[in-house]
Each structure stands twice: as structure tokens, then as C-alpha cells.
């Protein structure tokens, strides 16, 4: 029932004009949030890769058959072929499409691999800032991306072991940059 409701929501919220799902709802502006979750008219068309690529892969994993999966995947492939900028969060979502073999064009897979290689955090100093951490794009040693990024995975695992708090958590390496100061301390925990 939960998956069926999610699929119904996706079908109801598909933007035929932009060939994607919204990355965020307009209602998000009613609540405390990080600045990157501010909704405006431009955010409607930003969901081509994020969250769409991840959604398509998840729907395939659940055996859902929907023409929107094919439409969305086709749009993603078109965007990749056009040379569209691939941001860090886009890469996180595209990895599931690559690992699920939804992107069959090896040149596009190589493009995604190269983008990950160029953007993934490579030093412990990189990990103290907001960025593309190896574990965000590499699920484990069987990942098709693991061999390209093994040193970075090992470096991040060592960093995580060194920076874990006494209670077993890790402090965020980002903030809301002064937006909703009254709500940030609760969100930070």
C-alpha cells in the first residue's frame, strides 16, 4: 500500500512540461529548512537527475512498471548527452541508474564515472567541508565505482573512525548559514 501511494503521488506530480518530478514542494517554504531547500519557480525544472534518477531506480527495484520511469530516464540520458552540468547531488542519484544498468551507453557511464572522480572528496580536509563524500556514491566493494575510488573510500572510513563523537554520532559539516537560527540547534542534533 505504501509503494502504491508513492507511485500515485509521483504520477500526480509529474511535470509534463519539464519531464521530471519536482525536487521540492512549494510547501517547504512554510517550515524551517536549509537554504538549498527554498522553493521558487526555478526549482520546478531542477529535478531531472535529483531526485528523478534515484526514484526511477527505486521504482525499478520494486518492479513498478510506469511509462514515467522510461520518460524520466530518457530525459536524464538526453541531459547527459547535451553536456548538462552534473552537480554532486545529481551524481548521488545517477549512481543508482548506473548500478541498475538503466544507462546502457558506456560513454555516458564513463562521463558519470569521470564526474565522480573529479568531484569526490580526496583528503580529510575535503571531508571537513560540505561535498561529495565517497560513501554517498559508493555503496560497497561490489559497486561498479569502487575500484576507481578505493583510496578515497579507505580515507573516508579512517576519517569517520577518527571523528566519531563519544555518543556514536558525527557532527554535521554544514549548517543553515544563519537561516532559521532558532530552529537550527534542534535540527543539528
Predicted regions and their residues:
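Preference for long, amphipathic alpha-helical scaffolds in soluble/luminal domains
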Residues: 1-189
Amino acid at each position: 500500500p505504501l509503494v502504491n501511494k508513492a507511485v500515485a503521488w509521483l504520477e500526480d506530480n509529474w511535470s509534463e512540461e519539464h519531464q521530471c518530478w519536482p525536487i521540492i514542494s512549494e510547501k517547504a517554504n512554510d517550515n524551517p529548512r536549509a537554504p538549498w531547500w527554498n522553493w521558487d519557480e526555478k526549482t520546478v525544472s531542477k529535478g531531472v537527475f535529483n531526485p528523478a534518477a534515484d526514484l526511477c531506480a527505486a521504482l525499478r527495484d520494486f518492479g513498478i512498471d510506469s511509462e514515467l520511469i522510461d520518460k524520466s530516464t530518457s530525459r536524464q540520458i538526453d541531459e547527459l548527452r547535451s553536456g548538462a552540468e552534473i552537480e554532486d547531488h545529481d551524481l548521488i542519484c545517477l549512481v543508482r541508474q548506473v548500478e541498475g544498468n538503466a544507462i546502457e551507453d558506456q560513454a555516458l557511464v564513463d562521463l558519470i564515472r569521470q564526474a565522480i572522480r573529479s568531484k569526490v572528496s580526496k583528503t580529510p580536509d575535503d571531508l571537513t567541508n560540505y561535498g561529495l563524500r565517497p560513501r554517498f556514491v559508493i555503496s560497497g566493494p561490489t559497486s561498479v565505482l569502487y575500484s576507481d575510488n578505493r583510496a578515497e573510500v579507505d580515507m573516508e572510513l579512517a576519517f569517520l573512525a577518527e571523528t566519531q563523537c563519544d555518543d556514536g554520532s558525527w557532527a554535521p559539516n554544514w549548517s543553515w548559514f544563519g537561516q532559521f537560527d532558532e530552529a537550527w540547534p534542534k535540527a543539528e542534533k
